[in-house]
């Protein structure tokens, strides 16, 4: 019973830190927040965005073509509180606070009834869950983005909830349907979700495939159909000109050099009489995976794991607490010790998802020219807090 009170206190702390003077701190809305707020207000009043498009599934915004979830979620608080800073930031603070509770239940669900090695045997799942929730509640990384209008805060909430429902499905099969639904809808929540959500879902299915397709075959068919239907609806969005513009503006891959190399190789193939195999191995899509691009992506990936990015500066002044890293210095020894302990004593089939989640987090930002990027990698969380 006492631990339930601790959870309530942790949630109240998280709620206070995210809502206290939300309309004043940070001072003034930044341009992205203004655009999202005005789009939400326009939807409320006219059903159209600021450019006159009726109920769009991609918001043109500042010509950066945003996913739709945040704008639609902001409609209700703007209707209730008016068009102001507090109302625009309300969805981020609200779902950021709820994420703390969901993380608690996820960690408890995953670590419950597990047999761990050596000294890990005496640790209770509820204790790990409470500590994870507490560290996330005071995380400067999560707190910073929960106090401003960032789509990634909503996306992280959906990801944690989808994984929780997946594990709940082993107790009640109907939760697989909810998990699949949220994994699918999450694709519309943030650009990075297009990479992270499917990879997390695939990892979960492959990890438990034997159990899923024997004991829960009916649920898997239903859940699969739900995700496929949503994904089919999402495909036109993913390949729309607006989405392509967003990708071309942010990516760091050298398409021009790849296409030039592809054209040269195809000419050589034609002269050698091997045009069939040339079309397979030297086409412009395969050519993108050249050594220059692979080196750039891998370098960007590991930049997100450096102490400088995590503990000193995040690279963008507006994306971090001034004079403070994404993770506090005092958390460093606990993070290192926790990660080593997890790998040695707590890693098994059921907990593997946290390691995979941790490794998947930097992928979306690794192909962009602004790497390392704290917003595009925020789906990293809450693995850091779980390891701590």
For each of these PLM feature ranges, what is it?
Residues 2-296, 300-388:
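Membrane-integral, polyisoprenol-dependent glycosyltransferases
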């Amino acid at each position: 019973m006492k631990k339930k009170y601790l959870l309530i206190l942790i949630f109240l702390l998280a709620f206070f830190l995210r809502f206290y003077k939300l309309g004043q701190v940070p001072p003034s809305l930044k341009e992205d927040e203004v655009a999202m707020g005005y789009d939400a207000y326009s939807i409320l009043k006219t059903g159209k965005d600021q450019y006159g498009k009726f109920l769009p599934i991609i918001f043109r915004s500042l010509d950066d073509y945003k996913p739709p979830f945040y704008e639609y979620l902001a409609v209700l608080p703007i209707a209730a509180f008016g068009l102001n800073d507090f109302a625009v930031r309300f969805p981020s603070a609200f779902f950021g606070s709820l994420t703390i509770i969901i993380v608690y239940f996820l960690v408890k669900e995953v670590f419950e009834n597990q047999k761990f090695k050596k000294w890990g045997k005496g640790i209770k799942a509820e204790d790990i869950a409470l500590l994870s929730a507490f560290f996330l509640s005071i995380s400067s990384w999560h707190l910073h983005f929960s106090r401003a209008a960032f789509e990634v805060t909503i996306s992280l909430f959906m990801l944690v909830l989808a994984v929780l429902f997946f594990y709940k499905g082993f107790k009640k099969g109907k939760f697989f349907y909810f998990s699949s639904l949220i994994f699918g809808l999450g694709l519309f929540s943030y650009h990075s979700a297009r990479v992270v959500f499917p990879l997390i879902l695939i990892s979960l299915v492959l990890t438990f495939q034997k159990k899923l397709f024997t004991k829960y075959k009916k649920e898997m068919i239903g859940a699969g159909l739900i995700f496929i239907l949503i994904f089919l609806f999402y495909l036109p969005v993913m390949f729309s000109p607006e989405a392509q513009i967003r990708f071309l503006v942010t990516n760091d891959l050298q398409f021009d050099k790849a296409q030039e190399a592809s054209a040269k190789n195809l000419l050589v193939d034609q002269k050698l009489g091997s045009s069939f195999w040339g079309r397979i191995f030297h086409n412009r899509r395969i050519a993108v995976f050249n050594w220059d691009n692979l080196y750039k992506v891998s370098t960007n990936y590991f930049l997100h794991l450096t102490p400088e990015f995590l503990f000193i500066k995040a690279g963008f002044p507006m994306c971090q607490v001034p004079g403070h890293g994404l993770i506090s210095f005092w958390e460093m020894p606990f993070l290192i010790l926790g990660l080593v302990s997890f790998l040695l004593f707590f890693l098994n089939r059921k907990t593997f998802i946290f390691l995979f989640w941790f490794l998947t987090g930097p992928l979306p930002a690794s192909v962009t020219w602004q790497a390392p990027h704290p917003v595009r990698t925020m789906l990293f969380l809450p693995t850091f807090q779980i390891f701590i």
